[in-house]
Amino acid sequence: MNTKKEKIMLFKVYRWNPDKKEKPHISTYSVDLNSCGPMVLDALIKIKNEQDSTLTFRRSCREGVCGSCAMNIDGTNTLACIKSIDTNKKEMKIYPLPHMHIIKDLVPDLSNFYAQYKSIEPWMKTTEKKLDKEFYQSRNDREKLDGLYECVLCACCSTSCPSYWWNSDKYLGPAVLLQAYRWIVDSRDQGTRERLQYLEDPFKLYRCHTILNCTKTCPKHLNPAQAIAKIKQNITLLT
């Protein structure tokens, strides 16, 4: 017989259903942490399975590698699957990523974000028409990609950026710019000049004011602000 005392945590979750006339509101759920996994995503899944099947959110890998479960937890953009439940608190507040159109509950519309990602042409460019060999890199060139390729496109950084809040129709944002630099610095890519010329724009790149929210919030501990600064440096070297 389990006589362990309940350890109740309140989860206050943003709710909005476009199919109903209700305004957005907060629903509060009680969860016994003794029968719940350690991560916020565990609590959300438990709530959906046991209390409210209408609660809607994205999730997939549960390992911090897909970026699906990005949301704002206690004021910080992060991934719910790798965000530990703070057992020192009595409640946690969960909202969708800020300044985004919401599809339902904790699900933001990422259509514009993905369109911006597509615009930087995130694939290797080569001037050779026929390839019959691999593109080799030195160890040093390969190491230049560290801190870049790990980005999971969760949009936590971009949606934490005030410049992106106000100019998301023109400013590419820290996530997409970090991805752009990932290809600019890749020694195997042959489209560097073309990429830099595309980014040399007062809005696409230069809306970054080095606020550093992006670097602070990144759940993968990457540094988008540094990548953006290096893009600017590379542009100054164009002749």
Swiss-Prot record:
Record localization: Mitochondrion inner membrane
GO cellular component: mitochondrial inner membrane
Keyword Metal-binding: yes
Binding site for a ubiquinone: 166
Residues given in the record as [4Fe-4S] cluster binding sites: 151, 154, 157, 218
4Fe-4S ferredoxin-type domain mapped to chain residues: 141-171
EC number of the protein: 1.3.5.1
GO biological process per UniProt: respiratory electron transport chain; tricarboxylic acid cycle
Cofactor(s) of this protein: [2Fe-2S] cluster; [3Fe-4S] cluster; [4Fe-4S] cluster
Binding-site residues, [3Fe-4S] cluster: 161, 208, 214
Catalytic reaction(s) noted: a quinone + succinate = fumarate + a quinol
Protein name: Succinate dehydrogenase [ubiquinone] iron-sulfur subunit
Organism of this sequence: Reclinomonas americana
